């Protein structure tokens, strides 16, 4: 159980990160999937960041050096897109720009698993997935997944996430009923969010994009920036659900609530605990 002072510290940190994103409007390159581009871009815009959905391998050498951070999502991976992902990730790492890997449905094919393992070799700052994705990626074995949804709770994946963090050097974020963030030693739980968010496609992809924006303004505190992004997205979902009639209207309210988040609401609603 967190002490009140620790909880206040998390809450003030979350607000500070969101304020910095709004003030600095970091340029975030997203090489993401066809399904998620719209929601990812609008999530980033509503948080105050500047999204760029640039994915052509021809443009990487010219464009990527100018970004503040990179998001790579393999949701609709093809052999044509993989070189772009690798080129951008390699350049981001060389230039010490933070980047996030979202290994969507990583175990659905050998091609996808191999691609994600190759991307991990390029040193992502954060690896963000659901429980099944993190378990499959951690063991580098083919598991049974249900599309990009998760058949494992996030808490089931804690040990796999810690192992993956230690082997990859990345902070690992596991989305679920309780979001888990670990650097291999510390384990933080983010208890914000709502179940209905799982009924909207691309919310996980959008969360990865938001994490990238927060890393762009605080790359020296990767775990804390990741926790802040997950808390902010969860709070926006909670507020949105209170106004929504179902998933379609929640999608709209999620973006509006993220855009309108104020200090009082954030400080009151952040629910973060240390799990280990």
Curated annotation (Swiss-Prot):
Required cofactor(s): Mg(2+)
Catalytic activity: 5-(2-hydroxyethyl)-4-methylthiazole + ATP = 4-methyl-5-(2-phosphooxyethyl)-thiazole + ADP + H(+)
GO molecular function: ATP binding; hydroxyethylthiazole kinase activity; magnesium ion binding
Organism: Arabidopsis thaliana
Name of a matching Pfam family: HK
Function (record text): Thiazole kinase involved in thiamine salvage pathway.
InterPro entries in UniProt: Hyethyz_kinase, Ribokinase-like
Protein name in the entry: Hydroxyethylthiazole kinase
Residues reported to bind substrate: 53, 202
CDD domains hit by this protein: THZ_kinase
